[in-house]
C-alpha cells in the first residue's frame, strides 16, 4: 500500500487550521465575558485605593505606600491574603445557606452592570426597562445577606441580616419614585441609553440634576443606604454586632462581601452619573463628542474610549461624596434610619413624583 505524502500533509494542515479556528473561536467567546469583569475588578481596586488615600488625608496620616507605587496594589495584596486564608464553616450552622449567601450578593450586583451604558450603544443589554431591572436585581442582594446571617447560626449575624433586609426595603421604595420621575417626564423612557441621550442637548445645563434636584437628593441618600455606607452601616455595626452578617466568615467568602460592598458603591455612582450627570456626554453645551473629534456617532475605538473615560471620571468624582461622608457623619440608630426612610424620604419622593406628573399633564 502506497501512502501519498501530499494527501497526509493536506490532512494535517486542514486539522491544524480547524484546531486553530476552534482555539481562536474560544478566545473570542471568552473575551466579551472576561473583559467587563476585569474592568469592574480594576474599578474596585481604584475605589479602595481612593478611599484609603482620601481617608488618610482627612485623618492627617500616611495612607498605604509600600504595596506598589503610592500603595495602589494594597487592595490586591489584601485580596490575595484572603484568598489563601482558611475557609472556616460554623459547626451548627446551615452550610448550604452559609456558602450560597455571599455568591448571591456578588452575582446580583454584577448583573446590575449589564444595563449601565459607558458610551453610545456601549452597553451589554440596552432594554426598555433598564433602570427598573437594576432596582429589581439589586433587591436580590439583601436575600443573600439574610441567608448568610441565618446560616451562620449566630445571633449577631442574624441580627445583621435582618437589619440589611429592613434597610434595603426601607430605601428601595423612596428610590423608585425618583427613577419614575425621570422616566415619565424627562426622558419618556426607562432605557438608560435614552435617559443619557435626553440630557445631551444642552450639556451640563441639561443634566437631570438641575431639573430634578429634590429627586437627586433623595436618590443620593437612598443609594448610600443601599450601599450600607456610613452613616447607614447598621447591618455591620462593629460596636453592636461585631461584624454583623460577616461575623462567622473568613477566607474567600469574607473577601466576597468585601468586593460586593465596593461593587455596589461603584454601581450607585455609575447610576448617579447616568441618571443625573449626563452619562458619557462631554457636558459642554451644543458640543458633542462626535462633532468635536470628527468621528462617527456610532462609535469606533476612539469614540468609545472617550465615552468610557468621561463616564468613569464623573463616577469617580462623585465617589468623593460617600467617601468623605464616612468620616464626617456619625452612625444613626436603627429607629432613626427607618424613620428617615419611611417618614421623611418616602413622602418627599412621592410628592416629587406627583409634581412631576402634574407638570406633564399641564403641559399637554
From Swiss-Prot:
Function according to Swiss-Prot or TrEMBL: NDH shuttles electrons from NAD(P)H:plastoquinone, via FMN and iron-sulfur (Fe-S) centers, to quinones in the photosynthetic chain and possibly in a chloroplast respiratory chain. The immediate electron acceptor for the enzyme in this species is believed to be plastoquinone. Couples the redox reaction to proton translocation, and thus conserves the redox energy in a proton gradient.
NCBIfam families in the record: PRK06076.1-2
Reactions that this protein is recorded to catalyse: a plastoquinone + NADH + (n+1) H(+)(in) = a plastoquinol + NAD(+) + n H(+)(out); a plastoquinone + NADPH + (n+1) H(+)(in) = a plastoquinol + NADP(+) + n H(+)(out)
Protein name: NAD(P)H-quinone oxidoreductase subunit 1, chloroplastic
Keyword Disulfide bond: no
Keywords: Chloroplast, Membrane, NAD, NADP, Plastid, Plastoquinone, Quinone, Thylakoid, Translocase, Transmembrane, Transmembrane helix
Taxonomy of the source species: Eukaryota, Viridiplantae, Streptophyta, Embryophyta, Tracheophyta
Transmembrane segments: 27-47, 98-118, 127-147, 255-275, 301-321, 337-357
Gene Ontology molecular function terms on file: NADH dehydrogenase activity; oxidoreductase activity, acting on NAD(P)H, quinone or similar compound as acceptor; quinone binding
Biological processes, Gene Ontology terms: aerobic respiration; photosynthesis, light reaction
HAMAP family listed in its UniProt record: NDH1_NuoH (MF_01350)
Topological type in the membrane: Multi-pass membrane protein
Species of provenance: Illicium oligandrum (Star anise)
Protein family according to the UniProt entry: Belongs to the complex I subunit 1 family.
Pfam families, per the entry: NADHdh (PF00146)
Localization in the cell: Plastid, Chloroplast thylakoid membrane
Subunit structure: NDH is composed of at least 16 different subunits, 5 of which are encoded in the nucleus.
Leading EC class: translocase
Gene Ontology CC terms: chloroplast thylakoid membrane
PROSITE patterns in UniProt: COMPLEX1_ND1_1 (PS00667), COMPLEX1_ND1_2 (PS00668)
Predominant localisation class: plastid
EC identifiers of the protein: 7.1.1.-
Amino acid at each position: 500500500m502506497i501512502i501519498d505524502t501530499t494527501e497526509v500533509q493536506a490532512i494535517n494542515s486542514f486539522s491544524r487550521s480547524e484546531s486553530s479556528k476552534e482555539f481562536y473561536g474560544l478566545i473570542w467567546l471568552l473575551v466579551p465575558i472576561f473583559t467587563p469583569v476585569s474592568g469592574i475588578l480594576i474599578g474596585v481596586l481604584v475605589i479602595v485605593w481612593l478611599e484609603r488615600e482620601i481617608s488618610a488625608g482627612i485623618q492627617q496620616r500616611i495612607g498605604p505606600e509600600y504595596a506598589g507605587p503610592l500603595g495602589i496594589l494594597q487592595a490586591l495584596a489584601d485580596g490575595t491574603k484572603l484568598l489563601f486564608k482558611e475557609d472556616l464553616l460554623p459547626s451548627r450552622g446551615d452550610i448550604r445557606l452559609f456558602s450560597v449567601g455571599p455568591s448571591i450578593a456578588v452575582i446580583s450586583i454584577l448583573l446590575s452592570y449589564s444595563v449601565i451604558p459607558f458610551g453610545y450603544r456601549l452597553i451589554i443589554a440596552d432594554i426598555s426597562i433598564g433602570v427598573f431591572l437594576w432596582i429589581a436585581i439589586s433587591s436580590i442582594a439583601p436575600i443573600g445577606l439574610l441567608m448568610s446571617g441565618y446560616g451562620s447560626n449566630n445571633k449577631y449575624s442574624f441580627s445583621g441580616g435582618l437589619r440589611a433586609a429592613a434597610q434595603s426595603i426601607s430605601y428601595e421604595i423612596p428610590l423608585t419614585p425618583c427613577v419614575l420621575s425621570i422616566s415619565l417626564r424627562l426622558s419618556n423612557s426607562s432605557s438608560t441609553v435614552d435617559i443619557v441621550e435626553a440630557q445631551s442637548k444642552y450639556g451640563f445645563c441639561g443634566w437631570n440634576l438641575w431639573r430634578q434636584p429634590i429627586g437627586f437628593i433623595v436618590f443620593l441618600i437612598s443609594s448610600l443606604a443601599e450601599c450600607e455606607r456610613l452613616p447607614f452601616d447598621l447591618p455591620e455595626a462593629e460596636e453592636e454586632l461585631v461584624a454583623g452578617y460577616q461575623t462567622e466568615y473568613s477566607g474567600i467568602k469574607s473577601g466576597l462581601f468585601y468586593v460586593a460592598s465596593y461593587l455596589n458603591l461603584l454601581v450607585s455612582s455609575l447610576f448617579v452619573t447616568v441618571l443625573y450627570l449626563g452619562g458619557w456626554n462631554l457636558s459642554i453645551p451644543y458640543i458633542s463628542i462626535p462633532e468635536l473629534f470628527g468621528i462617527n456617532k456610532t462609535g469606533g475605538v476612539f469614540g468609545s474610549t472617550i465615552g468610557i473615560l468621561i463616564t468613569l471620571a464623573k463616577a469617580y468624582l462623585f465617589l468623593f461624596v460617600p467617601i468623605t461622608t464616612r468620616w464626617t457623619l456619625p452612625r444613626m440608630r436603627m429607629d432613626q434610619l427607618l424613620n428617615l426612610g419611611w417618614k421623611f424620604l418616602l413622602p418627599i419622593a412621592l410628592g416629587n413624583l406627583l409634581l412631576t406628573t402634574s407638570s406633564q399633564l399641564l403641559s399637554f
